[in-house]
């Protein structure tokens, strides 16, 4: 049983890493095919006049969204999963360092390294640089912030702040966040493909572990 649990731990961790790499790689300019589907659509529908974020905040939107900045843990990652990195015009300071630990950063580093820094991010926590954000003037801010932080930032910058949440690739709030990002950036079809891909991977893991008692299932930190 111990040997089985070790194998499952390694397998689950490997799947988590591979998922992150595959989902991000789909948005790169390489012609190499991957197992995850890639949408050929660049824009799916007309932008609504307002949107309700993960906290139930109703945020008024501009007529068009051609640019964004992403703040907080997971926000930029999910935008890259949605293949919306071309609309990013500012990044947090941590994105100016290339790292394999963040596949989306590693694959898009040549773009991110030259973008203005609009927040601290990383271990520095949620510290937006309001003046720099106003300078780059994005159409919308996508932020993995608390409701209070988002309200404060929106009041200071005058720019719509839509809150998303990233609690892991199999968390329901990530599905909701991807749907929000898809609507904001005109990537609904792509985001649906990503959600379906992750749900299929989750179901596969559940099928592989269904005969193991819950108290004997290994846990993985990713």
Question: What residue ranges belong to the model's regions?
Answer:
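Solvent-exposed loop/turn segments at secondary-structure junctions
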Residues: 74-77, 94-97, 140-141, 146-150, ...
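C-terminal motif of bacterial Sec signal peptides marking the signal peptidase cleavage site
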Residues: 20-25
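Structural recognition of the beta-strand scaffold that forms the well-ordered cores
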Residues: 67-72, 89-92, 140-144, 161-164, ...
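Extracytoplasmic substrate-binding proteins
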Residues: 51, 150-222
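Bacterial signal peptide processing site
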Residues: 27-30
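N-terminal low-complexity, Pro/Thr/Ser-rich intrinsically disordered segments
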Residues: 35-57, 61-62
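Bacterial N-terminal signal peptides that target proteins for export
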Residues: 1-13
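A short, structured surface patch at a secondary-structure boundary
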Residues: 76-132, 140
């Amino acid at each position: 049983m111990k040997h089985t649990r070790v194998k499952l731990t390694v397998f689950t961790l490997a799947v988590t890493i591979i998922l992150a790499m595959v989902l991000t790689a789909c948005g790169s300019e390489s012609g190499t095919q991957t197992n995850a589907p890639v949408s050929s659509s660049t824009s799916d529908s007309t932008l609504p006049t307002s949107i309700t974020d993960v906290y139930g905040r109703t945020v008024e939107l501009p007529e068009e969204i051609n640019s964004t900045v992403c703040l907080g843990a997971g926000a930029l990652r999910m935008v890259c999963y949605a293949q919306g990195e071309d609309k990013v015009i500012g990044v947090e300071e941590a994105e100016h360092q290339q790292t394999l630990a963040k596949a989306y950063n590693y694959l898009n580093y040549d773009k991110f390294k030259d973008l203005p820094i609009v927040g601290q991010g990383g271990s520095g926590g949620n510290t937006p640089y309001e003046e720099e954000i106003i300078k780059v003037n994005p159409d919308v801010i996508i932020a993995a912030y608390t409701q209070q932080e988002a309200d404060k930032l929106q009041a200071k910058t005058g720019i719509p702040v839509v809150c998303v949440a990233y609690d892991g690739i199999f968390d329901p709030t990530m599905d909701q966040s991807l749907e929000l990002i898809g609507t904001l950036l005109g990537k609904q079809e792509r985001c649906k493909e990503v959600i379906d891909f992750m749900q299929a991977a989750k179901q596969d893991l559940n099928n592989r572990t269904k005969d193991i008692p819950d108290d004997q299932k290994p846990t993985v930190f990713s």
